[in-house]
A protein has these predicted regions:
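Accessory cap/linker subdomain of secreted extracellular hydrolases
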Residues: 16-18, 23-132
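Short beta-strand/loop motif that positions the catalytic acidic residue
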Residues: 133, 138-141
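Catalytic histidine neighborhood in serine/cysteine hydrolases
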Residues: 160-174
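Short beta-strand immediately N-terminal to the catalytic nucleophile in serine-hydrolase-like folds
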Residues: 1-3, 28
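Conserved alpha/beta-hydrolase "acid-adjacent" motif
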Residues: 146-152
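Glycine-rich nucleophile elbow surrounding the catalytic serine of serine-hydrolase chemistry
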Residues: 3-13
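Short, hydrophobic alpha-helix immediately C-terminal to the catalytic nucleophile
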Residues: 12-16, 154
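Glycine/threonine-rich phosphate-binding loop and adjacent beta-strand/alpha-helix elements that clamp
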Residues: 159, 181-183, 193-438
Length: 438
C-alpha cells in the first residue's frame, strides 16, 4: 500500500492490523492522531483546514451522517444546540451555518468534529493503533506541515514495532502525486516485494533535512541521541537566554480581546557560533489570566543577522486542558490528556507545558532564535504550509494575560541543541567588552 495524506493514514491503519498478505507500506505525509494532529491542536479547534477541504470538494459532495445514526435524533440535536451555545464556535459564521444545516453536503463531517471537542472514542477509533504494528513501513513528511502530518509521522517512527524508515524534508509543498518520492518508494518496495538488495536497509533509518545548512543528515533514532536539551529562559525586555533569572525579572503581560490580540516576543542575543537545533521543542510557561480560559498560540522564529524574521513552527494549548498524561509525557514531549476541561481561576498562576512542533535548522553566527506568544492566530499566512497551521477559534472575551519569568516561576523554552554551544556561549551575545582607557 502507498499514498499520502488520507491514503497514508488508511495505509497505516490497515498495516497496524497486520494482515497476512500485506508485505509493506510506503506512507509518508499522514497524521496518526486525529484529535491532536489535525482538528484540535493543543485542545484548540482548528476549523480552517476542514472548512477549506469541505468547500474544495464542491456543493454536491455528501457524506453519510454516521454520528446521527449512532446517537439518535435527540442526543444529536442536543449536541448541536450545545455547540451553537459555545461563544468560540458561534463567532465563526461558517461553523454556525454547518451546525444549522447538518444534513447539507459534507456538513455532517464538520458537525461530528465540532461536537466531539474532547479526545474521546470518536477520535481514537479513527486514529492509528500502534499496539502491534509489525508490517515494514516507510514514513515521511516535511518541517513545514507542522499543522497536519508532521507529528503523525514522527509519532509513527517512535511507536511502530516493525522495520521502519523516516524521511523529513525541507518545508516545501511537494507536487502530486509526490513524484519526488518515486525512486525512494521503488527502492523500498523492490526490497520487500522482490527481494532485491537495494541497500535501503543499510542506510540510517532516519534522514532529516537541516534548513540553513541545506543538507541531509542521518540518525539512528528520534530524538537524536546527541541532543543537548537546553533551557532558554524568558526575561524582562523580551530577552531569551540560558541565564535562569536576574533580580529585575518579574513578569510580562499582554491584552487580548476580539478587537485586539496583543503578543509578547522573546529573542536570544546574536549566536556566537553556528548552532543546530533538531528535534522536539517545548515551552514551559508559568502564567495567569483575568479570565477563566486562555488559548496559548506560540510561534518559533528565526531571525537573520539583519533582523528579518521567518516563521519556523508553532505550538498550541488550551489552558483548561493543560492536564498531562504522566505515563506518555517526556520532558521534551508533553502529552496532554484532553479528556476534560478544568476552568482556570482568574489571576491564579498555573504551569502550562506547550508542545511546539519539531524542527531542524542550523543557525549561523550572528543569527537569533525567538518566540512569539499570543492568544490568537490572526496573522496572515505567507504560503500554503503556514495556512494549514492557522484557522483556530479564539476567545470572545477581553482578558489580560501575564507570563511569569523570575526565580519563583522560571518560564523557559526547551530547545534540542544537536550541534554547537559546547560550553554555553549563547548568553554572551558575541560582544567583547570594550577596554576603558585613561
Amino acid at each position: 500500500m502507498t499514498g499520502v495524506s488520507h491514503f497514508s493514514r488508511v495505509s497505516k491503519r490497515v498495516a497496524a492490523l497486520n494482515p497476512p498478505h500485506l508485505r509493506a507500506i510506503f506512507s509518508p505525509y499522514g497524521w496518526t492522531d486525529m484529535y491532536r494532529d489535525l482538528y484540535y491542536h493543543g485542545g484548540i479547534f482548528n476549523h480552517g483546514f476542514m472548512s477549506h477541504w469541505v468547500k474544495s470538494n464542491g456543493p454536491h459532495f455528501r457524506t453519510r451522517n454516521t454520528l446521527k445514526e449512532k446517537w439518535g435524533e435527540a442526543r444529536y440535536g442536543q449536541a448541536i444546540k450545545a455547540a451553537l451555545g459555545d461563544p468560540e464556535i458561534s463567532a465563526v459564521p461558517y461553523l454556525v451555518d454547518a451546525l444549522s444545516h447538518p444534513d447539507d453536503g459534507a456538513n455532517s463531517m464538520l458537525v461530528d468534529i465540532i461536537v466531539n471537542n474532547l479526545c474521546n472514542e470518536f477520535h481514537r477509533e479513527r486514529s492509528v493503533n500502534f499496539e502491534n504494528c509489525k508490517i515494514p513501513a516507510y514514513f515521511g513528511g516535511d518541517w513545514g506541515l507542522y499543522g497536519l502530518h508532521l507529528p503523525g509521522d514522527i509519532r509513527a517512527i517512535e511507536k511502530w514495532k516493525g522495520p521502519k524508515k523516516l524521511t523529513i524534508g525541507p518545508p516545501v509543498y511537494l507536487d502530486r502525486p509526490l513524484y519526488q518520492y518515486a525512486y525512494e518508494s521503488l527502492r523500498w518496495f523492490d526490497h520487500w516485494l522482490k527481494g532485491i538488495d537495494t541497500g535501503i536497509l543499510e542506510e540510517p533509518p532516519i534522514h532529516l533535512f537541516i534548513v540553513g545548512a541545506n543538507e541531509w543528515r542521518g540518525a539512528e533514532e528520534w530524538p537524536l541521541p546527541e541532543t543537548k536539551w537546553t533551557p532558554f529562559y524568558l526575561h524582562a525586555g523580551g530577552l531569551l537566554s540560558e541565564h535562569e533569572f536576574w533580580p529585575q525579572d518579574g513578569s510580562s503581560s499582554y491584552e487580548d480581546s476580539p478587537h485586539h490580540h496583543g503578543e509578547i516576543e522573546f529573542k536570544t542575543p546574536p549566536l556566537v557560533e553556528n548552532t543546530e537545533i533538531c528535534g522536539p521543542i517545548v515551552l514551559n510557561l508559568f502564567g495567569s489570566t483575568t479570565a477563566m480560559e486562555i488559548l496559548w498560540f506560540v510561534s518559533l522564529w528565526h531571525f537573520d543577522a539583519k533582523g528579518h524574521g521567518s516563521l519556523l513552527t508553532r505550538g498550541w494549548l488550551r489552558g483548561s486542558q493543560r492536564k498531562l498524561d504522566p505515563a506518555a509525557s517526556r520532558p521534551w514531549q508533553p502529552f496532554h490528556q484532553h479528556t476534560e476541561r478544568e476552568p482556570l481561576e482568574p489571576n491564579k498562576i498555573y504551569e502550562f507545558n506547550i508542545e511546539v512542533r519539531p524542527y531542524g535548522i542550523q543557525l549561523k553566527q550572528g543569527e537569533r532564535i525567538g518566540i512569539k506568544i499570543k492568544s490568537a492566530d490572526n496573522d496572515p499566512a505567507n504560503n500554503y504550509l503556514e495556512l494549514v497551521g492557522i484557522g483556530h477559534v479564539s476567545s470572545d472575551s477581553a482578558s489580560t494575560v501575564t507570563i511569569q519569568h523570575n526565580a519563583d516561576y522560571a518560564s523557559h523554552l526547551l530547545l534540542p541543541i544537536t550541534k554547537g554551544n559546547r560550553i554555553g556561549t549563547f548568553i554572551s551575545g558575541g560582544n567583547l567588552p570594550p577596554v576603558k582607557r585613561p
